Amino acid sequence: DLHSTSRRQRQMCIRDSGVGANGTHKFKNKTELNKFFQQEGPNAANYILEEFVDGEIVTFDGVADANAEPIYAASHVTPDSIMEIAHGKKPMWYYVAPEISPELRKMGEAALKAFGAKSRFFHLEFFRLKTAKPSLGNAGDILGLEVNMRPAGGYTVDMLNYAGGLDLYQIWADMVAFGAAHHPLARYHRYCCCAGRHDELRYRMPHEELLKKYRSCLNAAPRLPEVLAREMGDQLYIASFEDEAAMQAFRRDALARPRE
């Protein structure tokens, strides 16, 4: 039953009808599970209970042709749990990777065929396991998570464009009009990352100093509306880099908090 299962492994639940990590909960023990049922009452029937998977999210994003084959594909990585980001326990941070691993590409292309993703944007999500999980796989294995027949949300398409020096919307328009890309695909392969700050928190490097230090790398620094700010941050920074070390240095500067 649910209670005996919760003693053996961490659980999480998500709304049967919802968007992203909104309305998700994680349970580490029977007490937390009981509290959830008491709070939700009959509404608990509107949730799906699942085993919690410790993994980073890797995606397969792009535009498919009439044969469900990618005209262009790229991948972005979210190292921390989206649920923990949404609940304010982790800062918003994710990045477009310059390359797609052969395993991820194989699984992504197979999913496009299986779901008949013809002549459309696609946004496929996978877990890359951080630790071995009985019955699921070993650390580093990739597992299917979610299929979306639409572009990735937020500023992700812009980030894909910055990372590759292309226009994914133009590629989509070419697909609609001609069935193939008539404009350049990726001109280069860079990292493009997104970091989010909350106004109520203090950070080691002030906003203006961060903008000045990374002015040659920043693509955009948008403010988010209140409806999105709780999960993603009030202030976003989107920047591109040639190598991972430079990107990680930016992450530290953008998200480091004052030492206690």
Residue spans for each PLM region:
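Single conserved hydrophobic/aromatic residue that forms the stacking wall/gate
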Residues: D1-R10
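Peripheral (often C-terminal) accessory segments that flank ATP-dependent C-N-forming ligase machineries
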Residues: A173-E260
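Conserved anion/nucleotide-ligand pocket segment
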Residues: Q11-K26
